[in-house]
Amino acid sequence: MEKQKPFTLFVPPRLSSSQVSAVKPQTAGGDSNYFKTANKCTEGDFGVPFTMSSRENIDKDPAFQKLSILPMLEQVANSGSCHYQEGVNDSDFENSEPMSRLYSKLYKEAEKIKKWKVSIESELKQKENKLQENRKIIEAQRKAIQELQFENEKVSLKLEEEIQENKDLIKENNATIHWCNLLKETCARSAEKTNKYEYEREETRQVYVDLNSNIEKMILAFEELRVQAENARLEMHFKLKEDHEKIQHLEEEYQKEVNNKENQVSELLIQSAEKENKMKDLTFLLEESRDKANQLEEKTKLQDENLKELSEKKDHLTSELEDIKMSMQRSMSTQKALEEDLQIATKTISQLTEVKEAQMEELNKAKTTHSFVVTELKATTCTLEELLRTEQQRLEKNEDQLKLITVELQKKSNELEEMTKFKNNKEVELEELKNILAEDQKLLDEKKQVEKLAEELQEKEQELTFLLETREKEVHDLQEQVTVTKTSEQHYLKQVEEMKTELEKEKLKNTELTASCDMLLLENKKFVQEASDMALELKKHQEDIINCKKQEERLLKQIENLEEKEMHLRDELESVRKEFIQQGDEVKCKLDKSEENARSIECEVLKKEKQMKILESKCNNLKKQVENKSKNIEELHQENKTLKKKSSAEIKQLNAYEIKVSKLELELESTKQRFEEMTNNYQKEIENKKISEGKLLGEVEKAKATVDEAVKLQKEIDLRCQHKIAEMVALMEKHKHQYDKIVEERDSELGLYKNREQEQSSAKIALETELSNIRNELVSLKKQLEIEKEEKEKLKMAKENTAILKDKKDKKIQASLLESPEATSWKFDSKTTPSQNISRLSSSMDSGKSKDNRDNLRASAKSILPTTVTKEYTVKTPTKKSIYQRENKYIPTGGSNKKRKTAFEFDVNSDSSETADLLSLVSEEDVSNRLYDNNPPDSHLLVKTPKQTPLSLSTPASFMKFGSLKKMREDRWTTIAKIDRKRRLKEAEKLFS
């Protein structure tokens, strides 16, 4: 995956106190470039990219890719651009804020964004961790399910294996013969291996003793197993009898339960028929509600037509009332008070209606609210009557004043009478509309209550459907379980027993590890356990039958509970219907009372209108009433429109309810069908269980027969085991005699080996003495080397002194040579001392050839060292090349006699003078061939060294090698002995397993 580009914020560099902030003026459109350059500066020069270490993880997350952090930058950019524009307009940067403050603000905002990022990162990580935990839990659950499936398969495989084990008992006779052959083979192998295992005689004897003890233990164990098998057989007989009696009792109880269930099924069918009748009643009620809805629609249409007519009449009245408005202004003051009172009354009425709508859900509180409303209405009527009385008093005062005006107004009164007729008609129509609206409001309230009840019923129906579905699922699961029990009845008992045995084994592993050593005991115990397992299987099967019966009882109880719930719901529906009827009666009574009150008010209004015909004040009041009525008409138009919308919405809701009712009817039919299927399935299951009980009884009889056969086979096997044990004992005694003979032969061979070892130890002691002598000689030789080195140093000093004296004596030499030739001969002899000394040494060595080798070695070392070694080495073992170079320096060119030469070869890898650094003498011819490439050299060394015997120098190394080989052999014998012990033990276990 390619890494996304990190999100970097514009953060300018931090300016120190010494830095100066200077900004170059820019154009209005150059803000983006400014931010780009600033970003480059911050990232390149100052190295402050405000990106977190975990930023890549945020950028990779798709949730953060959608987040837009740019609005923060846009705000900063806009603020920067505003500052910049102000600066451009003012044309001086001194008055503006310094850039350092702006940078600090941006830096703070960037830090806030960082913190925000960190918090969001932590939240996302927590969510991811939760998701991962949930996934792990799901995977663990899946794995657990798979493991359970595998365990079930393993259990089935184990059952098959046990069946095969029963067949393998017949083949054990051939296996015992094979065991005998294996014993013979092991004896032959042990005879072959005794040649190798010479040092393990005592251990083999112990093994044979252990085998004898094991055989005795086996004999005792077989006798104990016989007794246990007889006891187990008797226990099995008693248990089978008890199980047979229990099965008979269970059959009787099962038949009784079947009869009870059949009676319950018949009762359930009767209850289902009653439920169908109730559903039919509900359908009739729904049809009635539909008819009522249609009637309401027709009423709304009529109201719309009446409103149109009223609007037309209103237009005519407005044109006529414009002339009367001037005369109506005087009575405005009195009318405003009345209007305010009416508005207060309307507000109180609206509040009461809202309270009623809120309290209609609780039917017990509805009566109290109505009583409060009635009292408030009475109070309002009393207030209105008092106001009317005050107005009458005022009118009486104004009558004296208006008598003069009556003459003028008689003409207008005729016109007003006509107007009043129209107004009366309109008022009647308005009152009718008001009544209709009140009825509509009541109907709406009732509809709301009906909707709420319907919603509650829907919720209850959903709960019932959910419960029915759960019950159906449970019933389906039970059916599947019953089918599974039918199919797994044959293997179920064995599975449960095996699971129990496995659990017992796991619990007793820590305490019974010692008991698992003897495999024969476990095999014989299996025969006893099989008989007990059959009894346990029968018990488990009986328990399963009881559990199935309990499950059936639970299902029946659940069905009864569901039926009771349905009855409760039906009772609730009936109570709700009764409540609706009661509420309708109460509403009708209230409407009648309101109509009577309205009629009484109308009578009073008519009386007042007659009085107003005489008085102008009454005319003015009438005009104002007309205006108010016109306003009310407009409000009524709006209310009618809202009512139309509400009625259309209610129609849609009714249609939806009808659809839901149809769905519920279908669901009820489906539930009936399912119930019938359930009853049929239960009947079939009962029949199948009866058949399975018969099969189980047959299987029990078969099991009894198999137990008897197993007892017979066990007796036969016991007899065969006794014969085989006797044969095994005889064979083991024969093998004992053979092994005793082999052990005696091996003892004699071991005695010979011990004698040889004693001889070798004596030779070893002699060789050790020789080594000690050689070491002493080497120490003496080293001391001689040191003495000779000191002599060489003295000779060097003498040579230096002679070289100094040569210069002084050069002039005297010629005279001395002429005078005394004998002196010259002496000098010549003194110059040629090294060669003469060598010749003398060689003659002495030739004369001493008849001596021992040790004396020759000492003489050769003494003769070689003064001639060859001229330098001192601090290293204990010098290299061969240095020795050869020293020898080449002092080799004389003259001479024709070929003689032997000795060279000391030191061990290169050693830095010490221990016994490992032995001197090895090499012949002169070998060294001369190396130095001169097979050319005939002159007689440069006159020392002859005789060839050493291999015993003198090679015996210590051979002795060391012999010791190491002996140790290696002993280690090998011990490892082979251990491996062979393990093999013997394994073979013995196989023989007796």
Curated annotation (Swiss-Prot):
Motif Nuclear localization signal: residue span? 114-117, 697-700, 898-901
Q: Where is this region: Required for pH-induced assembly of C-terminal ends into antiparallel tetramers?
A: 694-788
- What are the alphabetically sorted keywords of the record? Cell cycle, Cell division, Centromere, Chromosome, Coiled coil, DNA-binding, Meiosis, Nucleus, Phosphoprotein
- One Pfam family it belongs to: SCP-1
Under which name does UniProt file this protein? Answer: Synaptonemal complex protein 1
Q: Where is this motif: Mediates head to head self-assembly of N-terminal ends?
A: 98-108
Give the record's GO biological process terms: cell division; chiasma assembly; homologous chromosome pairing at meiosis; lateral element assembly; meiotic DNA repair synthesis; protein homotetramerization; reciprocal meiotic recombination; regulation of protein localization
In its UniProt entry, the species of origin is given as Mus musculus
Q: Which intervals carry biased composition (Polar residues)?
A: 831-847
Where, by residue number, does the polypeptide cross the bilayer?
none
Q: Which gene encodes it?
A: Sycp1
Q: GO cellular component terms?
A: autosome; central element; chromosome; chromosome, centromeric region; condensed nuclear chromosome; lateral element; male germ cell nucleus; nucleoplasm
Description of the deletion phenotype: Mice appear generally healthy, but display complete sterility, due to defective meiosis during germ cell development. Ovaries and testes from mutant mice have strongly reduced weight relative to wild-type. Ovaries display an absence of growing follicles and oocytes. Testes show a complete lack of spermatids and spermatozoa. Synaptonemal complexes from mutant spermatocytes form normal axial elements, but lack the central element; chromosomes do not synapse properly, cross-overs are rare, and DNA repair after meiotic double-strand breaks is impaired.
